[in-house]
Amino acid sequence: MTFIIKKVKNIFSTKKINNKTNNNNFKNENLNIKNEILNNNNNNNNNKNNNNNNNNNNNIENNSKNENFNNFNKIHNSPISSPNLSPSLNSIDSINLNKIIIQNIDNFETNGNILNTSSPSLNSSVAKNNFIISDIQDIDWNNLVNIELLNNNINNNNNTNNNNNNNIIILVTFYNGYDDFNQVILKSSNTMVQDVYASVLQVILKYPVPEMRLIDSCEEEFNKMSINLLKQSKLQSEQLFNIIQTQIEKPFFLIMEYKNGGKFFSQLNHKEYFSSQKNGEKKLKQLGKLLSFDLICNINNNICNFNYNNCNNNNNNNNNNNNNNNNNNNNNNNNNNINNCNNNNNNNISLNNSNNNLNSIFNNNNFNIFSNIIFYEQPDKNGWYFGIIHSSILCLNSSSFTPGYRNTMDRIKLLLFSIFQNPTTESLQIYHFRKYLSNNCNINLPSSSVHWSTNIQNGIAKGIDELVNSLNYQVFASTKQIVNNMIFSTTDQNNNNVIINNNNSFTWKKGIDLIYIPFLFDVLKEIIIEHSNYKNKSKK
């Protein structure tokens, strides 16, 4: 099934495909794909022999790259033969297709860790951003020419054994001829349902969420995507191939619109980017608005983690006595039963360890602060300088009876009180966040740091105002129902909605059950109370 999130207020366009139709076409298509793999295997065995001869002749590097590009064209242009497969292969269903791909992929042409298989003219055109579009609908997966990991935490990690527990965000490039390139973002996730839920809420709040659609492993397109991702990643590097191989075992992928020319937070010249000459004040306020969303959906993973006096004491003791610091950390964990001050010795921001997903704003890798955001020099048509490439929710199933519930609410109250009480004064939480960026990430903000902080705080206050006016219990509940019906939904003879039962639908249902509306609403109520107190005080 597919869905599209449109960047229009409260409009969600859902494309549904009846799973009960075209079954024969689906099977035939899968057989054709399998047969294509077998044909490619035979072709590429010959290619391997050619490469061996090339290596023996010690051809120069440029000739080797050209040979690989030719082989790439052979792979992608090889005809799909008719499905005259043996009975044993005919009996293999679509669920096992990825296993066939993985078993046969080694027969594809490779040559070490080639980082780019495109021709020099293609590379130069991409570098100049000529004729680049981002069309998530009409994708010809056979035209895939490059894969780039956008997750710095995976990209910089040589250990790929545990990549199945990670989520990847990759940029894929398609060459459609005549210097026409299409670039889209692909995202896999262990918590796809929660990610989609958060994205829908962000659309309601008019945040810069890209157009996106969801595909699942029961679809024909998913198989075509998997085949071409494996082919191209094998041509580029063994590490990338291993990552892709584990990710395509997940049941869902998001295809997202991509706007080129952006940077991650760690790549910015922060003093220049947030300077007054470049609308730095507006950028900081927008960043604050995104932080306000995390107060609801990522409470264990946001700016509130900088508000504990015990954390401050531990950081000070860290300079004097590491043993005392360890004891303080243990006491905090026992008393609060939540990961607020965890790992202060390593100066890590605390995370909810029960979740493996990418963190919406912060990440335990020092170089992945604001890792879900791409920063742009020029605003989009709605005035946003950012693009959100990852959304998620933490602490979904907490209630008043779970450890840390009251602690969570107190953290929200303390942050909002400090911001609303003195909006023009840098709050303690923002102060420690700024110090963290400077001391741990080597990110030095503009010299007028208090101005930087107060703009962030003003953005949080503005974001809170929009949250209070846009969200309520009914919105949380109806959004959950929207996400529940996004895929595997069809109609019976009486036009009643029916959920199709298969492995993917069960996985989706489990994700839906983890979205605990009462907790989200309790958090919102605390925010509403603090917001109301601030408004009443302002009127006096």
Swiss-Prot record:
Indicate what this protein is called per its UniProt record: Putative actin-fragmin kinase DDB_G0287957
Q: Which organism is it from?
A: Dictyostelium discoideum
What are the protein's UniProt keywords? Coiled coil, Kinase, Transferase
Taking the record's annotation, the residue ranges forming a coiled coil are 27-68
Which family does the record assign? Belongs to the protein kinase superfamily. AFK Ser/Thr protein kinase family.
Pfam families this protein is in?
Act-Frag_cataly (PF09192)
- Source organism, top-level taxon: Eukaryota
> Which GO MF terms are attached to this record?
kinase activity
Gene3D superfamilies (UniProt xref): Phosphatidylinositol 3-/4-kinase, catalytic domain, Phosphatidylinositol 3-kinase Catalytic Subunit, Chain A, domain 4
Which region ranges are annotated with the description Disordered?
Answer: 37-70, 317-341
Task: Say yes or no: keyword Kinase present.
Answer: yes
Keyword Kinase part of the UniProt annotation: yes
